[in-house]
């Protein structure tokens, strides 16, 4: 109990000291460039309706699909503890086959080709 009170006292004092020091430190006034928004590769003061390549959008959607696939397949090692592990294997195989067929379809349609033909 004594150790708990000591740790609580030290953390409270340390937090108060850091809060007081942060108010005493001089504040820097930012200039115009630091106040303007920054987006990598885009002029923040230009038009908000810049043309956007649909290929970036397609790659982002594919990334989200495969990221979701990983999230669904991560608990599979614990699936062998279920009453019927073959059922879990069947659903995991169906998911992988469906995503593989979708990737092949996207590849054949040219959605993964970056260069214009």
Swiss-Prot record:
Keywords: Electron transport, Membrane, Mitochondrion, NAD, Respiratory chain, Translocase, Transmembrane, Transmembrane helix, Transport, Ubiquinone
EC number: 7.1.1.2
Subcellular compartments: Mitochondrion membrane
Top-rank lineage group of the source organism: Eukaryota
Record has Magnesium as a keyword: no
A Gene Ontology molecular function term of the record: NADH dehydrogenase (ubiquinone) activity
GO cellular component, one term: NADH dehydrogenase complex
The reaction(s) this protein catalyses: a ubiquinone + NADH + 5 H(+)(in) = a ubiquinol + NAD(+) + 4 H(+)(out)
Major subcellular location class: mitochondrion
Membrane topology field: Multi-pass membrane protein
Coiled-coil region: none
TM region positions: 3-23, 56-76, 85-105
Enzyme class name: translocase
Record has Lyase as a keyword: no
Role according to the record: Core subunit of the mitochondrial membrane respiratory chain NADH dehydrogenase (Complex I) that is believed to belong to the minimal assembly required for catalysis. Complex I functions in the transfer of electrons from NADH to the respiratory chain. The immediate electron acceptor for the enzyme is believed to be ubiquinone.
Entry similarity comment: Belongs to the complex I subunit 3 family.
Protein name: NADH-ubiquinone oxidoreductase chain 3
Species this protein is from: Tetraodon nigroviridis
Lineage start: Eukaryota, Metazoa, Chordata, Craniata, Vertebrata
């Amino acid at each position: 109990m004594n150790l708990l009170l000591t740790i609580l006292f030290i953390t409270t004092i340390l937090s108060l000291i850091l809060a007081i020091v942060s108010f005493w430190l001089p504040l820097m006034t930012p200039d115009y460039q630091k106040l303007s928004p920054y987006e990598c590769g885009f002029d923040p003061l230009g038009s908000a309706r810049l043309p956007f390549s649909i290929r970036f959008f397609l790659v982002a959607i594919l990334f989200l699909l495969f990221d979701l696939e990983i999230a669904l397949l991560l608990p599979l090692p614990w699936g062998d503890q279920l009453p019927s592990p073959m059922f879990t294997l069947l659903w995991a195989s169906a998911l992988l086959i469906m995503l593989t067929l979708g990737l092949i379809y996207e590849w054949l349609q040219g959605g993964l080709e970056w260069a214009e033909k």
